């Protein structure tokens, strides 16, 4: 399901003469038409799968499917990462068995590939420039975004300013050190999901992970929920949206747009 974008442009005076109409905006931004919804994508910069010698990074479907779902709705997207520059892609996510319509579209889209090769460094990003944030997964976030103080501060800032924060698969690792205004874990008492222990075990990587997401979220006091392995499943709890696995990435994007549409309608 796709949710329409709604924008409200207030304070415009319409005057007419000689068969023309002119809009006089109350602010300069209105002169350029309705404000576009702006969403920040934060991706991993980490490309090493523990001590295995194998490469990791973004699971490309978790980037591509939400990216095109949102872009097709007219959303303006900025892509950032801890280090900036080239964002690594997990080579396993590029295997034919993991190909989807969204990933095929990505590999035929040189402009978006170029954007993923030139991400903005997190230290150049400000929450005030965006309406929401989305974190795609892949195993990379388990190492860098889980421990990145700039990422944690950014998530906290979005949340404190009543802006949605969304994550899929391994990306909830980025919530590991995020606190609320009282100093408690942001996920405490909230309904969340993530890549599960059994999904990690099925992939044969339990021992390679620095921690298990399901365990970490439960230890932080989250009300952890999950569906059967590999099934689409996503949860919204207030401003926090989480999805279980790659199959859940579009669900997360849909829930994110639902929150933004609701927020715009209430303005």
Language-model regions: role of each:
Residues 1-6:
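Positively charged n-region of N-terminal signal peptides that target proteins for export
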Residues 7-17:
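Bacterial N-terminal signal peptides
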Residues 20-22:
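Sec/Tat signal peptide C-region and signal peptidase I cleavage site
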Residues 24-161, 173-267:
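Extended, subdomain-level signal for the structured scaffold at the beginning of enzyme domains
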Residues 162-166:
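Conserved, well-structured core segments that form or line functional sites
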Residues 169-171:
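Catalytic nucleophile serine of serine hydrolases
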């Amino acid at each position: 399901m796709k949710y329409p974008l709604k924008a409200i442009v207030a304070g415009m005076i319409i005057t007419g003469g000689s068969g023309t109409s002119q809009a006089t905006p109350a602010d300069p931004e209105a002169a350029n038409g309705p404000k576009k919804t702006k969403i920040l994508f934060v991706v991993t910069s980490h490309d090493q799968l523990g001590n295995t010698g194998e490469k990791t990074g973004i699971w490309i479907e978790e980037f591509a499917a939400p990216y095109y779902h949102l872009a097709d709705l007219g959303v303006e997207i900025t892509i950032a990462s801890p280090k900036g520059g080239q964002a690594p892609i997990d080579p396993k996510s590029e295997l034919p068995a993991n190909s989807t319509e969204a990933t095929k579209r990505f590999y035929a889209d040189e402009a978006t590939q170029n954007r993923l090769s030139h991400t903005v460094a997190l230290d150049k990003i400000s929450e005030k420039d965006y309406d929401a944030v989305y974190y795609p997964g892949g195993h990379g976030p388990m190492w860098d975004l889980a421990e990145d103080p700039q990422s944690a501060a950014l998530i906290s800032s979005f949340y404190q300013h009543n802006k949605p924060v969304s994550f899929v698969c391994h990306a909830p690792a980025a919530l590991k050190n995020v606190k609320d205004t009282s100093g408690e874990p942001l996920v405490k008492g909230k309904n969340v999901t993530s890549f599960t222990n059994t999904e990690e075990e099925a992939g044969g990587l339990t021992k390679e992970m620095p921690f298990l997401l399901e365990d970490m979220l439960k230890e932080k006091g989250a009300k952890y929920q999950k569906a059967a392995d590999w099934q689409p499943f996503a949860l919204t709890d207030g401003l926090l949206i989480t999805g279980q696995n790659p199959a859940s990435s579009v669900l997360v994007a849909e829930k994110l747009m639902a929150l933004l549409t609701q927020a715009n309608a209430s303005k």
